[in-house]
Amino acid sequence: MKPHSGPWNLKLLKDPFWGISIACYVIHRFWQALSPDSGWMDRHWNDLWMLPCALPLILSLYGALGLRAHASQPTGAEIFWHGLLWGFMAEFIGPLLFDHAVSDLWDLLAYALGGFLMFFRWHFTELRFFSIALRF
């Protein structure tokens, strides 16, 4: 496959949804350190944002390595297979390798919801309102 023009194509990282996802993740990490356990939000909020935060970075890396032929939004198959692989590794392989890791099926639901948010955003919405502030 032919790599993108330049060593990194950062089109996916310029998308407002990626910035919002990173902000949700980071703000929650700081908030989580200051607050008591608040149930589902405390335990699964960051799992929800895992795919929207990580997949654009991974796909940009694939492009830089010449493993991805286009720089457009992630396809449904890319979202599904990366989410499935991540869920399998984090919830089934991780607990076998690390004593502190715990398999939690609610995490799988959070990964799936995050994948659905990604798919919905990149295939059914425009978010033009936010694109003005995040243009490069």
How would you describe each model-predicted region?
Residues M1-F136:
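Bulky hydrophobic segments
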